[in-house]
C-alpha cells in the first residue's frame, strides 16, 4: 500500500518569534509488507548549518526518547523456566517468549496491564487470539506465537508495560512479580530506523539555505507523522525552560572565604582562659559574633581588660587576617 502526500504544515512555533517559520512536507508515506510504516519528510528552508542541528536532534529523540509498549514477562501454565517445553506445542518456551517479544502493541495506560491466552489445538496461534485489556491494541494480529498439535493446550498470562528504548531482563527485580513469571528483554522503541540528509535549498536566486530530508521507519504502533510530532514536542519541552533562565551569581571568592572564616568558633583563636571565659559569658561564640565588637566594646565586657583586648586583636590578625575597629563609628 503506497501513499504520497504533498500537504504542507507550518512548523513556526511561538518560541521562534524572531525567525521566519519553515515548512515540513510529507514527501512519501506507505506501509511495507512486513508491517513497517515508512514516512519521508522535507523540512525547510533552514538557515545554513541548521539542517544538521535539527536532523541530528530529531534522530536521537526519535530513536531513544519516544515511549512504546511491549510485553515484559510471561507466565505459561506448567512451565517454571525458559528451557522447558510445552506438551503438544511445536515451539519450545524460548521460541514462544521470542514471539511474544516481537508483538507490536499500542497502549496509553500508564500502569502495567495483563493479557491472557487460552488456546487448544490443533492449529496455529496468532496474536489475534490474545485476550487484551481494553486499553491495549495489537498492531500485528497475524503475528505467529505457537503451533499446537491435536489436544494440546497453551495457557499463558503476560504483563504489558510502557517504557523507552531497550530494557534488558533485570533478575534483581524478580521479587516484585510471581516466581513463575519469565521476564523477557523488552523493546519499547516504536521507531525502528531514522535517516536524514541535508541538501541546499533555493530561496529566490540564493542557495544559502538548508533543506532537511528525514526518513522514519516505525513498527506501526505510531505512524511516522505521529513519531515526528512527538519528537518535536519533546525537544520543545527540553529547550523552552532555557528561554527565561536565570542564574544565581556565585559569591565572590573573597566573600565566600570571609563567610567561612566568620563561622569559626572562638576556640580556634586559642585565647587565654581568662579572655576565652569572658567572651563566652558575653555570648560571643564565633568569629562572626566577635566581629560585631570594636576594641572599645570589648573593654566594656565584665573583667575584660586592655591586655585581653590586645590578645583578641592579635589572634584575629595572626590567625585569620581579620581586624577589629578601635572605636565605635562617630555617625
Curated annotation (Swiss-Prot):
One of its GO terms (biological process) is DNA-templated transcription. SUPFAM superfamilies: C-terminal domain of RNA polymerase alpha subunit (SSF47789), Insert subdomain of RNA polymerase alpha subunit (SSF56553), RBP11-like subunits of RNA polymerase (SSF55257). GO terms for molecular function: DNA binding; DNA-directed RNA polymerase activity; protein dimerization activity. Keywords: DNA-directed RNA polymerase, Nucleotidyltransferase, Transcription, Transferase. Disulfide bonds: none annotated. It comes from the Bacteria. GO terms for cellular component: cytoplasm; DNA-directed RNA polymerase complex. Its EC number is 2.7.7.6. Residues 256-331 are annotated as: Alpha C-terminal domain (alpha-CTD). InterPro entries: DNA-dir_RNA_pol_insert, DNA-dir_RNA_pol_RpoA/D/Rpb3, DNA-dir_RpoA, RBP11-like, RNAP_asu_C, RNApol_insert_sf. The keyword Ribonucleoprotein does not apply. Coiled coil: none annotated. It catalyses: RNA(n) + a ribonucleoside 5'-triphosphate = RNA(n+1) + diphosphate. The keyword Nucleotidyltransferase applies. It is an enzyme of class 2 (transferase). It holds the Pfam family RNA_pol_A_CTD. Residues 1-246 are annotated as: Alpha N-terminal domain (alpha-NTD). In cyanobacteria the RNAP catalytic core is composed of 2 alpha, 1 beta, 1 beta', 1 gamma and 1 omega subunit. When a sigma factor is associated with the core the holoenzyme is formed, which can initiate transcription. DNA-dependent RNA polymerase catalyzes the transcription of DNA into RNA using the four ribonucleoside triphosphates as substrates. Belongs to the RNA polymerase alpha chain family. This is DNA-directed RNA polymerase subunit alpha.
